[in-house]
Amino acid sequence: MNGSKPALGIGLWQLWLALGVLWLATLPVRPLFDPDEGRYGEIPREMWVSGDWVTPRLNGVKYFEKPPLQYWATASIYSVFGKSEWTSRLWSAALGFLCIPLVYGFARRIGQSRHVATIGAMTLAISPLYVIVSHLNLLDQAFTFFITATVFALSLIHI
């Protein structure tokens, strides 16, 4: 061995980058599904347009059925990139994508090899249902991300 880094490390970063590009590029492939995606896109739009970031509204009616974090994040994305199907889904997609390295990190943390951790993360990344849900503007992906991040954080403390 000459002490140089293995080519696999470079390949994994290239794979990670390609996955990220594909993950985000496929967001606007189809229109928003009714009723949920439209609702979770309209509430942040109304926040963004009205400037009232405290009271979520749907068609002008106060809407307190869900926690506001996703609305705030999506409205913030609208203020930077504008309103589109892509920006409506960006928060959920980003959180879904960020779960992948958390799965890898958790697997490594509990003593799995890099190979096993990579297989676990890539299995999640190519699981059809996970990818589909991550590409929908729904609250489920934020919930999944924060539960996964909590499990990973607890593994840092207790393992």
Please name every model-derived segment.
Residues N2-I157:
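Membrane-integral, polyisoprenol-dependent glycosyltransferases
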